[in-house]
Swiss-Prot record:
Gene Ontology CC, one term: chloroplast thylakoid membrane
PROSITE patterns: ATPASE_GAMMA
PANTHER family: ATP SYNTHASE GAMMA CHAIN, ATP SYNTHASE GAMMA CHAIN, CHLOROPLASTIC
Subunit structure as annotated in this protein's UniProt entry: F-type ATPases have 2 components, F(1) - the catalytic core - and F(0) - the membrane proton channel. F(1) has five subunits: alpha(3), beta(3), gamma(1), delta(1), epsilon(1). F(0) has four main subunits: a(1), b(1), b'(1) and c(10-14). The alpha and beta chains form an alternating ring which encloses part of the gamma chain. F(1) is attached to F(0) by a central stalk formed by the gamma and epsilon chains, while a peripheral stalk is formed by the delta, b and b' chains.
Coiled coil: none
The protein's name in its UniProt record: ATP synthase gamma chain, chloroplastic
Compartments where found: Plastid, Chloroplast thylakoid membrane
Transit peptide: 1-35
Membrane topology classification: Peripheral membrane protein
Cystine residue pairs: C233-C239
InterPro entries named among the record's database cross-references: ATP_synth_F1_ATPase_gsu, ATP_synth_F1_gsu, ATP_synth_F1_gsu_CS
Keywords for the protein's UniProt record, in alphabetical order: ATP synthesis, CF(1), Chloroplast, Disulfide bond, Hydrogen ion transport, Ion transport, Membrane, Plastid, Thylakoid, Transit peptide, Transport
GO MF: proton-transporting ATP synthase activity, rotational mechanism
Length: 358
């Protein structure tokens, strides 16, 4: 037994014991080695092809991330000027009670969750993180006795929640390759219709906030109602906000008018006091708030897309690195088996020559 183990070890490590082996055993061993070499060679070729695909996907995702970032930057002038106008109008109505259907606070019996996921996979845990965040918020709200409806943006989220009967999906949207104002407006119209018709008493957005190429954070943000207060409680004094909710604050602080987490540093100036509005400032505010909401949704879509592309780029980069390591290991294994095959053939030749001369 010890001699047999030593013989096998010598064959695989490229060391031959030069002991003659029976022809039948040597023949079967040769066939097994040849079959093993072909299998390893095929695996190496498969890994190489996979690496080419992951490298290409990484480059495509990197290029798209840059375009997504540029889209956010290009939209800033519009957002900045809109904030300036909103600031000026808010100055006119801040002493008055803003009577807007989008600011109406009522008892929260139904919440609409707008969930932003991707249309495709191969992006690491991006979609899974958003889905888990939504499920946790769903359980939290249902434990309070609140009815929850879903609006799914992105096929992955829609497919996941559609397979589970406890979730009620009222509408689904496709994210698309590049978010547009038309897509954001379509989502905003669905949200407004649900809120104004009192089908939903509160609307929350669940999306991934883009921080950097290697970091993103699933976030819950209250969209409606838009209130001049921080924590949102209904008329019965019941607060249903998430612990990490980012609430839209209709306020002005140091000349700023935006969602607090964005920490906007836009320099705004009050409108000229002599400026005369054709409509009441409250009416203008009612017209501007939906526009501002659409721009917020568009920016959220852009951030979600940038987060998805960054996650895909990192996932494909890790896949490429793993493919390189796997290819390296398979190459070493192939060389060892090839060396063992050559050593075995030499041993057979030497054994045959010794038997013939004997």
């Amino acid at each position: 037994m010890a001699a047999m183990l030593a013989s096998k070890q010598g064959a695989f490590m490229g060391r031959s014991s030069f002991a003659p082996a029976p022809k039948g055993v040597a023949s079967r061993g040769s066939l097994q080695v040849v079959a093993g070499l072909k299998e390893v060679r095929d695996r190496i070729a498969s890994v190489k092809n996979t690496q080419k695909i992951t490298d290409a996907m990484k480059l495509v995702a990197a290029a798209k991330v840059r375009r997504a970032q540029e889209a956010v930057v290009n939209g800033r002038p519009f957002s900045e000027n809109l904030v300036k106008v909103l600031y000026g109008v808010n100055q006119r109505v801040r002493q008055e009670d803003v009577d807007s259907p989008l600011c109406a606070v009522r008892p929260v019996k139904s919440v609409l969750l707008v969930v932003l996921t991707g249309d495709r996979g191969l992006c690491g845990g991006y979609n899974n993180f958003i889905i888990k965040k939504t499920e946790a918020r769903y359980r939290e709200l249902t434990a309070m006795g609140v009815k929850v409806n879903l609006v799914c943006v992105g096929r992955k989220g829609a497919q996941y929640f559609a397979r589970r009967k406890q979730y009620n999906i009222v509408k689904s949207f496709s994210l698309g390759a590049a978010p547009s104002t038309k897509e954001a407006q379509g989502i905003a119209d669905e949200i407004f219709a649900s809120f104004i018709a009192q089908e939903s008493d509160k609307v929350e957005l669940v999306f991934t906030k883009f921080i950097s190429l290697i970091n993103s954070n699933p976030t819950i943000q209250t969209l409606l109602p838009m209130t001049p207060m921080g924590e949102l409680c209904d008329v019965d004094g019941k607060c249903v906000d998430a612990a990490d909710d980012e609430i839209f604050k209709l306020t002005t602080k140091g000349g700023e008018f935006a969602v607090e987490r964005e920490k906007t540093t836009i320099e705004t100036e009050a409108l000229d006091p002599s400026l005369i509005f054709e409509q009441e400032p409250a009416q203008i505010l009612d017209a501007l708030l939906p526009l501002y909401m659409s721009s917020c949704l568009l920016r959220s879509l852009q951030e979600a897309l940038a987060s998805e592309l960054a996650a895909r780029m990192n996932a494909m980069n890790n896949a490429s690195d793993n493919a390189k390591e796997l290819k390296k290991g398979l190459t070493v294994q192939y060389n060892k088996q090839r060396q063992a095959k050559i050593t075995q053939e030499l041993a057979e030749i030497v054994g045959g020559a010794a038997a013939t001369s004997g």
